[in-house]
Amino acid sequence: MMLGLESLPDPMETWEIIETIGKGTYGKVYKVANKRDGSLAAVKVLDPVSDMDEEIEAEYNILQFLPSHPNVVKFYGMFYKADRCVGGQLWLVLELCNGGSVTELVKGLLRCGKRLDEAVISYILYGALLGLQHLHCHRIIHRDVKGNNILLTTEGGVKLVDFGVSAQLTSTRLRRNTSVGTPFWMAPEVIACEQQYDSSYDARCDVWSLGITAIELGDGDPPLFEMHPVKMLFKIPRNPPPTLLHPDSWCEEFNHFISQCLIKDFEKRPSVTHLLDHPFIKGTQGKVLCLQKQLAKVLQDQKHRNPVAKTRHERMHTGRPHRVEDAGKCCLEDDLVNLEVLDEDTIIYWLQKRYADALIYTYVGDILIALNPFQNLSIYSPQFSRLYHGVKRSSNPPHIFASADNAYQCLVTFSKDQCIVISGESGSGKTESAHLIVQHLTFLGKADNQTLRQKILQVNSLVEAFGNARTAINDNSSRFGKYLEMMFTPTGAVMGARISEYLLEKSRVIQQAAGEKNFHIFYYIYAGLYHQKKLAEFRLPEEKPPRYIAGETERVMQDITSKESYRTQFEAIQHCFKIIGFADKEVHSVYRILAGILNIGSIEFAAISSQHQTDKSEVPNPEALENAACVLCISSEELQEALTSHCVVTRGETIVRANTVDRAEDVRDAMSKALYGRLFSWIVNRINTLLQPDKNICSAEDRMNVGILDIFGFEDFQRNSFEQLCINIANEQIQYYFNQHVFALEQMEYKNEGVDAVLVQYEDNRPLLDMFLQKPLGLLALLDEESRFPQGTDQTLVDKFEDNLRCKFFWRPKGVELCFGIQHYAGPVLYDASGVLEKNRDTLPADVVVVLRTSENKLLQQLFSIPLTKTGNLAQTRAKITASSRSLPPHFSAGRAKVDTLEVIRHPEETTNMKRQTMASYFRYSLMDLLSKMVVGQPHFIRCIKPNDDRKALQFSQDRVLAQLRSTGILETVSIRRQGYSHRIFFEEFVKRYYYLAFRAHQTPPANKESCVAILEKSRLDHWVLGKTKVFLKYYHVEQLNLLLREVMGRVVMLQAYTKGWLGARRYKRAKEKREKGAITIQSAWRGYDARRKLKQRSRRRSESEAHIHTVLQTTPDQKYCPDSGGESNRGHEETSRNCPAEADTDGHPQAQSPPTGCDVTSGHADTAAGYTVAELSVAGTDVSPSLVYHTASAHQRLSPCEDSLKPGSEEGLSQKQRAPRRRCQQPKMLSSPEDTMYYNQLNGTLEYQGSQRKPRKLGQIKVLDGEDQYYKCLSPGACAPEETHSVHPFFFSSSPREDPFAQH
């Protein structure tokens, strides 16, 4: 949120709450008084919850910067009341409108048998239009115009309020595309934005809302107000524009005004400015004051009557879940178990009534019935995902998102795998339902990895492009079984996915029935390559389509290249490959293999005669053979040899035999089926590799799964073959699984636990499954047995069925040789046995395998190098060795393929041995594998119903629906869900789950009946039963218990959060104190170290100086002066000066001292080794001759080894001068030459004169100095001259004016 909450003022300093006015959408509204001037206002108190931040800021910005207008509520400011416990409150202080809303006024009048006068309605609408015009002129769309947002003042003023969802338009964005508002007042174009992402709207959406408000002013409620708000989103776009309930009771202008506001095409809808010129509104403009007084009188009259309860219609927003406050509004017909009368006619009536209202979902207890609407509905947007997130099921209408949410909540709450079983006939909507479940589970399990979520959402689209096709009854029929497992962490975050595929209908690649098509991907890739001008690269023709996709009409090629949907789907498939993580080389290899399959289908064969009268075959169109070989990167000669001949190994000898035309065509088609089947398995395995969970996030033991079964539905065509037999057997197995969980296991536990419950009769299909799957006399076992006989034919197969399958479920029609009938749970089906044996054998010659393993396409090599599993798919273990990387797999590297090829060429019998698995055995193992995955999870059933066979929207065929209800056991399910107990939980598990509801957290209640009773009574549940070891609950009991447990756990989490926050703050405080203490310790240590370092440096420098001084002193006694008359006396004076310091005589003149030795006068400074200067000697009164000074300096220069090399003016000399400052404790140097005496006498005279002219100081300003001060002891009246920078007066050795200090005076 951009608002700085802490910077806002505290409202308690200015405002005082007087009373509660009402309740808004997201907070209460109070009347407040200003503490300073007593003025009244209204305040809307909002909690700063994260999902309202956007609205708060939008409303604040609009109110703050919008200029004032008589028909827009005034804004006094925003305040923030801090509260650490609840997070603080925002106060929006607005103008007080004591008249209430127009909705309250109209309802109050209608309650008294009255209604608003048309003139007053016109006046209210006129004020609202002026307010909207003011907003629109400032590029603001209100987007929530309704009666509750039009307030009245006691003087009859009309004010627009509530700008929480208003939109600010800009010069570059004059439209919006967010679906937001209150459903009853939302315009059709606003609702359309949920489903149609290219839709948008402008300010005229407020005109539609105003038209609905006009109806509300007349009738008291908006149209269809009794409906659920979510249902209204279905109705508004489809229904004609609403009108008043009794249009004849109102004037024509009012009806016309409403009709103009409610034009569904907003481009033709008038604007607010145009509506101000409408006759119904224009007649008000000259009567504003009169009508205002009339409205004020009506308000005054209403004030004396009883207040009317306010009706709030919550607005809906894409960014926020919508919750219905009153759960009791849930319609009874939402759940068929609640119906008083339970029979077929009643159930069909309610299903048809709901379907007519576009309510396609209905509950049967905890089972969901979904009717295919055969149209796009706008009920699957993110807004609805938020709507069905962790709420009570009865709070919202039935929805597939509710079933997904139920499975997710059970997963997180009980840490147990879940299984969602979607079943129904072909064309009933199972695949789309699976899409929606994955979409909602991905939303619920939001992970930090956004890429992973996008990958999972793309998986279904990619797999269905390769595994779905158009059939006679379904344009997007699944031609394989798919079990998608979504993996979650213990906290509920999605972390990966895995697909298991079963029984791909490979025979569709080579042949399709009348009115059907091949797999979608062939049309997508052909159209995509055509528009990319790449057909020639993949050796595909541009004029005549390949035989596998040619179809029956001659316009196939034109349809493929001209259909925009095919090209769009191809681009979508490319996007899926990229998002999921396929490498570009992998995708290119996939395209080459698909193109190779299409080219193989175009190869033709012709018979040729030979000398030995043996049928042979040849390829009359070598260009097709060359194209296929080129795309597959194999030799055309080897391919032709593999198609037209085969090798037989007998007693160690290899015999090459020619293939007949029919056998060559079978080999060609078998090669195409094997290529496509193995390519499909590789794509699935590759997806599993790219979506496998990260082991660092969660271990395999802690991982939880939600399985989604989307399997081909029950089929009954005009011609049913081996594929339909396998599909229907699989549906029989799913129906048996449903019966076991819903009926058999439940009633068995009634008997074992001694529970008195009504037993429901149901149709058990176990005998039929035994007829199919038992050994050795089951149908599939007999089929495998006959397939192993080389002389076996389709006729002998049917005879064997008739001889061994003697039961009521099997019959053989008379007059039809190769047919047999099966009485399935969904009805009787007649099967054609032609080609069943060959399809079951699914023979692929070893010569074809060898040729394909020599391909230069590394992916193609891999497809025929990896062995097949018992379910007929490529083994994942081998793929992990070569495809463990998430980018480009290593099998694309050079040199690796030849090793695999040579390794597997030695064992071609893996794929060609007659003892290998048949299609029936693959099918049997596939069912076993599928059931082993399903039984580990808690099941959730979704029964899809096909309302008609014509695939027309909103057309309901009672006979077709009733037949499906009977076959799936829905009627019996309603009875057992009403009378039975769908949840049976052991005492120990029940107490472990729910003991928080009745016991304290530290308590450990025993797992017995008493504890269970305490929990159930504390939860205020009824109609439960206790058995010997289990608690028997209704389907709705578990939901109520889970909601109560979630509330308790929410409070626990809140308490833990506060505690953890307090502990964290305390740890932080202690860590901060410890850190500060450590910093002080470090700083102290550093300061000590630095002080010791500096002291050590000073000590070192002193030591060096002392060493230097000792060196100089050692050379002093050996100094020799030049002969001079005063030499002896000077030495005597030297000794005297060393022994006796200078003392002042009685006259104040210092006594003379002998000059010390070692004074360097040439360097211009006092030698620190001697400790005295020549100037000090002069002050003492000793006459120092120039010759003496000269010879002394000379002697010093000769006898000072440390300065012997220094020359005046050199850098060494300069540094030496700088290193000789006067010591701090040394006495002032004194000069006493005659010239100095004269100079200082003149100076003293000047100072005395200046002192006489200066005003005397006051006594308080005079500083009394101690006569014992050390400075004054050393300083005599004749020695008050400041220290010279030179040791000896310059004229002793130089006459240069620059060096003479007196020359400046």
Swiss-Prot record:
Q: Where is this region: Actin-binding?
A: 927-949
SUPFAM superfamilies, per the entry: P-loop containing nucleoside triphosphate hydrolases, Protein kinase-like (PK-like)
Entry EC number(s): 2.7.11.1
Gene knockout outcome: MYO3B single knockout mice do not exhibit early hearing impairment whereas mice with a double knockout of MYO3A and MYO3B are profoundly deaf at 1 month of age. Cochlear hair bundles have abnormally long stereocilia and show dynamic shape defects during development.
SMART domains assigned to the protein according to its UniProt record, in alphabetical order:
IQ, MYSc, S_TKc
Q: Where is the Protein kinase domain?
A: 15-281
Record's catalysed reaction(s): L-seryl-[protein] + ATP = O-phospho-L-seryl-[protein] + ADP + H(+); L-threonyl-[protein] + ATP = O-phospho-L-threonyl-[protein] + ADP + H(+)
Q: Which cellular component terms (GO) are annotated to the entry?
A: cytosol; filopodium tip; myosin complex; photoreceptor inner segment; photoreceptor outer segment; stereocilium tip
Gene Ontology process terms (BP):
auditory receptor cell stereocilium organization; cochlea morphogenesis; positive regulation of filopodium assembly; regulation of actin filament length; sensory perception of sound; visual perception
Similarity comment: In the C-terminal section; belongs to the TRAFAC class myosin-kinesin ATPase superfamily. Myosin family.
Full protein name: Myosin-IIIb
Which species is listed as the source?
Mus musculus (Mouse)
In the record, what lineage is assigned to the organism producing the protein? Answer: Eukaryota, Metazoa, Chordata, Craniata, Vertebrata
Q: Gene for this protein?
A: Myo3b
